[in-house]
Every structure is written in C-alpha cells, then in structure tokens.
C-alpha cells in the first residue's frame, strides 16, 4: 500500500512538473512571438493548411502563394524575389492540419516553435547516441543548448522551417537501423523526403547502404509509408502529384536563394561558372569514394558518411538557404564527441573551442549577411573536421581504455 501511494505521488509530481515546464515554455515562446514578428516558413505551411480546411483550396493554388507573398512583402513578389510557392508533397499539409485548425497565427506559431525546440533537443540526443558517447549531464545540456541557439538552428526555429524535423527523421532512421528497427527506419526515410534538396543525397546514400546489406525490410517500410501517404493524398487531391511536380520546376527557376555558383560568379565574374563546376566535381568525386567505402559497413561509418554528405550538399550548386544547414547539426556534434572521447583533456579543450568557433563564426556571418560563410567556408571547415576524426569513427575501439573513454 505504501509503495503504491509513493508511486502515485511520484507520477503526480512528474505530471505537474511536465505541465508546469510545458506551460512555462509555451508562455515564454508566446511572449517572444508577439514581440518578434517572423515565421515566414511556418506561415507558408499554416496558411495553405488553413485554406484547405476552411475553403477547400489546394496547397499548390496561386491563392495561397499570393497570400503568403502579401504577408511577407506587403504585395505580390517581384521576379527576382522568392515566390514562396508551396513545393512539398501534398501529405506535408496533411501533417500540418492540426495547427491549421488554429485561427490565431501567434498561437499556432508558438506551438510550432515549442515543437521545433523539442525536436532540436531530440536531434542533439540522437546525434550523441549515434556517436557512441555517454557524456555527463553538463555535456548533454551543452549540446542541447548549442543545437537550440547556433545560427542555423535558431533561425530555423524562428522562421518555422521543417528542416529540423527532416534532420531528426533522417538521423533517427540511422539510429533505428543501429537498433535493427528496419521498418521504422524506412518509414522515417519516407517522411524525410519533404525537403528533397536538403535530404535527397543523404537518403540516397542510406538507400545504397541498405541495399548493400540486403536489409529489404527498410525498403518495405519506406514503400509502405509512401504508398499510404500517397494514397491519402490522391483521395483528397487527385491532381496533387502533377501540381507538386510543376511547383518544383517553378521553384528551381527562381534566383532568390544563393548558391555556390552565384557566390563564385560574384567573386570571379569570368571564371565563376567553371569554378563552381570544379567544386561540384570535387564534391561528387569525394562522395563517390566515400559512398563506395561505406557499403557493407556498420552504422557508425554510415553516420559519419551521412554527416559528410549533408555538409557537402551546398557544393552541388543548388539554391540553398543558410537555415537548411541546421540539417548538419549531427555532423558538428559528431566531431565534438570524438574529440571529447578520444583525446582526454586536450580533446575536451579542442571540442569546446571548435563548438565555440562554429557558434560565433556563423552568428557573425548571419549578422553581417555573409552568405559565403554558410555556403562555402562552413562546409569546407566541417569537411576538414570530419576527415580529421574519420579514423576514430570508422574504426571501433579495440583497447579497454577506449571503451572506458566512451563511458565518460
């Protein structure tokens, strides 16, 4: 009887604590939302979802595009400006419908921000788990705070981007693969196809790895999830796939977002295109050899290669938003964790310096509007750092001292 009462009190205490923390988090975010007008990416999801519920307007309709443009610019977008055309699969809107029911944009955005903050913390936890490190609570807190407040993460939360959800799904799929939950991994990868320009290469890599190990249940989960989502989408909007295809084409013709090609053309007007092609060729060659090397290997090697792929994605020359670099958070934490695990006090010092350098450097670049840092310098720096720790990631610990290091 006494044990039952103690358990009941503990459960009640935990519930009160969760409700209190959740309420405080919601209230703090709501105050921030009312003071700082932003959330353009979320508005581009919320408004089509609301119009679908209230008026039956499909997400790809120009009515939605014009409403988002007027909210952003106060008018229709000019030819050189971002159009904010909805360019994701239809089922994304179905997943956003719960917040689409909320008529108050501030309340809806607040709930979305709280969800993104929790996703960011979860992503940091998944990254540390994949790195094989069991750090102290201080390190866990530091990693979570870094994920929340470094420039790409903070901006993705501020604007309401889906990229953090995408990162959690893709790297969560690798975690599921490590635990042999293959069908779940396939479902995660199917849901990770929302931002194809961000996640496409990483998902392709994981698909090649899965085929090399003949883990067909992953493909079964992937295809089953896509089939269910696609079927529901066709029931609601029979023409959604063609609308989605043409919206992608319209978006790719835009020139509002920067790319490595536009940066190099600005620096070297006569050689920019050739230099951009050379950078892309080097990225393709490097990833070709790494993708070949990871076939048949374990999930730690796959994690490292996926991090490298995410970091090098901007070098392929596609239009790329700096916010999307939040997808590379696990790569940063992988470098941080290897330094902390393998090199003792010196490693901890270098890990903190690296983390601080990335944090400060990207915020300086954001405040100074230095797009080249996000799309060129940061990927180069992270590529160097990933190769610096490659040997320790791809080779399992062989000595008892290495095993002890992973526990600390």
Predicted regions mapped to residue ranges:
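Primarily membrane-embedded glycan-assembly and transfer machineries that use lipid-linked glycans
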Residues: 1-184, 209-329, 333-340, 369-371, ...
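Transmembrane helices and adjacent periplasmic/lumenal helix-loop junctions
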Residues: 189-208, 316-324
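Membrane-embedded alpha-helical segments of transport systems
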Residues: 194-198, 228-232, 350
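Aromatic-enriched
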Residues: 335-408
């Amino acid at each position: 009887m006494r044990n039952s009462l103690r358990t009941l009190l503990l459960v009640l205490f935990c519930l009160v604590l969760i409700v209190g923390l959740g309420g405080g988090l919601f209230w703090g975010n709501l105050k921030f939302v009312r003071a700082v007008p932003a959330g353009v990416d979320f508005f581009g999801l919320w408004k089509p979802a609301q119009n679908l519920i209230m008026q039956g307007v499909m997400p790809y309709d120009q009515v939605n595009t014009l409403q988002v443009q007027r909210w952003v610019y106060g008018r229709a977008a000019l030819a050189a400006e971002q159009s904010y055309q909805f360019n994701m699969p239809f089922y994304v809107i179905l997943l956003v419908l719960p917040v689409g029911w909320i008529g108050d944009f501030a309340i809806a955005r607040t709930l979305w921000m709280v969800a993104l903050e929790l996703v960011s913390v979860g992503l940091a936890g998944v990254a540390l788990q994949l790195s094989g490190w069991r750090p102290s609570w201080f390190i866990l807190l530091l990693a979570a705070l870094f994920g929340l407040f470094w420039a790409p993460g903070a901006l993705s939360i501020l604007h309401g981007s889906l990229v953090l959800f995408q990162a959690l799904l893709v790297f969560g799929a690798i975690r599921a693969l490590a635990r042999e939950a293959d069908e779940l991994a396939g479902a995660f990868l199917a849901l990770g196809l929302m931002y194809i320009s961000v996640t496409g290469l990483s998902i392709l890599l994981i698909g090649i790895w899965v085929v090399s190990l003949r883990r067909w249940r992953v493909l079964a989960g992937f295809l089953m999830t896509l089939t269910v989502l696609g079927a529901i989408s066709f029931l609601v909007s029979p023409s959604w796939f063609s609308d989605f295809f043409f919206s992608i084409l319209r978006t790719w013709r835009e020139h509002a977002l920067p790319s490595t090609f536009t940066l190099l053309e600005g620096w070297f007007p006569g050689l920019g295109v050739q230099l951009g092609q050379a950078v892309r060729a080097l990225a393709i060659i490097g990833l070709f050899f790494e993708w070949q090397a990871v076939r048949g290997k374990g999930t730690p090697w796959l994690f490292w290669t996926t991090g490298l792929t995410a970091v090098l994605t901007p070098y392929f020359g596609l239009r790329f938003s700096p916010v999307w670099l939040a997808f590379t958070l696990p790569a940063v934490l992988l470098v941080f964790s290897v330094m902390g695990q393998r090199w003792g006090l010196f490693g901890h010092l270098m890990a903190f310096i690296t983390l601080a350098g990335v944090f400060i450097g990207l915020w300086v670049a954001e405040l100074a509007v230095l797009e080249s840092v996000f799309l060129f310098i940061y990927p180069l720096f992270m590529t160097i750092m990933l190769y610096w720790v490659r040997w320790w990631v791809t080779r399992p610990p062989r000595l008892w001292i290495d095993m002890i290091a992973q526990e600390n």
